[in-house]
Amino acid sequence: MKTIVVCSGGLDSVSLAHKMAAEQQLIGLVSFDYGQRHRKELDFAARCAARLAVPHHIIDIAAIGGHLSGSALTDNVEVPDGHYAEETMKATVVPNRNAIMLAIAFGLAAAQKADAVAVAVHGGDHFIYPDCRPGFIDAFQRMQNAALDGYASVRLLAPYVDVSKAAIVADGEKHATPFAETWSCYKGGRLHCGRCGTCVERREAFHLAGISDPTDYEDRDFWKAAVSQYSAKEVR
């Protein structure tokens, strides 16, 4: 299938891009500048596209992101430290982010006669992000079937939606993903901070997968305390 990958430049979506390059006909990556404080992730998406020799489109929706106030990713709100599944991480929710991005990606796919859009939502996202859950993925596919009825048929591929980030690390290793060429940290500093939810999740995933983590963290050990102290109930 001719497939476009929504790629932020993070570990999950870059691993997905390498997976799709191996298993499907990858025809491009699409990324979004929504005014995120960790915009440097887009540089890693560009490197991924160059590495896989496919076109890379960066869609500027910063004007929209500016109206989605109250998120630590787009507003003057501190990025919390701690486990990625804790209630405090709701500060990192950008309302309707995936719905907005996927709607644009599907329009792009239809215009380019692509067969599928692939997105790297995963099981670890279910706790906090409603637009990463299986119910959302299924509902979005139904909506797009109606939106493109008679014009195009585009599938939404979410191969990681029911698996852990550790499983993504293992899959990325299988498909030769250069993990050092990915960016996760929400704070967007020179190095991964090692303390925000996505850094904790990244560090834990490599540990659980039994794969060496090449990432340079400002705080390499905080994740252990964060993981030992959290409790959260998954929502699907």
Curated annotation (Swiss-Prot):
Alphabetically list the UniProt keywords. Answer: ATP-binding, Ligase, Metal-binding, Nucleotide-binding, Queuosine biosynthesis, Zinc
Gene Ontology MF terms: ATP binding; ligase activity, forming carbon-nitrogen bonds; zinc ion binding
InterPro entries xref list: QueC, Rossmann-like_a/b/a_fold
> Is Metal-binding included in the keywords of this UniProt record?
yes
**UniProt EC number:** 6.3.4.20
The protein's matches in Gene3D superfamilies, at most eight in alphabetical order, are given as: HUPs (3.40.50.620)
- Residues bound to Zn(2+): 185, 193, 196, 199
Is Cell inner membrane there in the keyword field? no
Top-level EC class? ligase
Task: Provide the cofactor note recorded for this chain's UniProt entry.
Answer: Binds 1 zinc ion per subunit.
Which PANTHER family does the UniProt record give?
7-CYANO-7-DEAZAGUANINE SYNTHASE
**Similarity comment:** Belongs to the QueC family.
- Name of protein: 7-cyano-7-deazaguanine synthase
Q: Which organism is it from?
A: Rhizobium etli (strain CIAT 652)
